[in-house]
Amino acid sequence: MIPSDHFVRFYNEVFKFLDQKKGLTDFYLEISRHQEIHCLELFRKKGLEGMEEYWGHIRKEENCVSESWIDGDVRYSHMKRCPSLSKVLDNDAEPFAGYCEHCPGWVGPLMAKCGFYFVDNIMGERVPECRSFMTKDREKAECLLKEWKKQYPEGNFRTNFELLKAQK
C-alpha cells in the first residue's frame, strides 16, 4: 500500500497533468462514481446521519483536524487542518493551484444524486481549511450561502445547485 505522504504527492502531480489535458472535471466525476460504492446507499437511507457515519470514519482514518455537526436539516463540516493539502504543502513540488477542488469535484455530484444541496468554502489554495454544508432544502441552502458570503468575503465557494436543477 502506498503511504499517504506519497499518495498526495502523486495526486498533486496527476491533478496538474489532467488540468493541462482538460480532463480534470471528468476525473472528479469518475471518482464520484466510484465513491457511490462506499456511500450512495448510506446517504440515501440515513441522510445526514449517514454522512456523519461515513465522514466520521474518514476523519479518524485520515487523522483530520475537523468537526462536524447536524443542526436540524443541515450537516455542517469545518476542516480545520486538511491532512491532504498539508502534506502537499510540505513537500518540494509546487502545489497544484486547484488541489482542493477534488473534494467538491466528487462530493457535489454524489450529493446531487442523493437530493442534497452542497456548498463548500475553500478558504484558499494554500490554506488547508474548508467549511461545507449539506441540506435537502434549496431555500435554506441559498440563504446559508448568502450568509457565508457575507461572513467569509474572501471565500472560494463551490456548489452543486446546477446539478440538482439539471436532474429535475
Language-model-detected regions and their locations in the chain:
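Anion (oxyanion) recognition and catalysis
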Residues: 112
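N-terminal accessory segment detector
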Residues: 1-101, 109, 117-131, 135-168
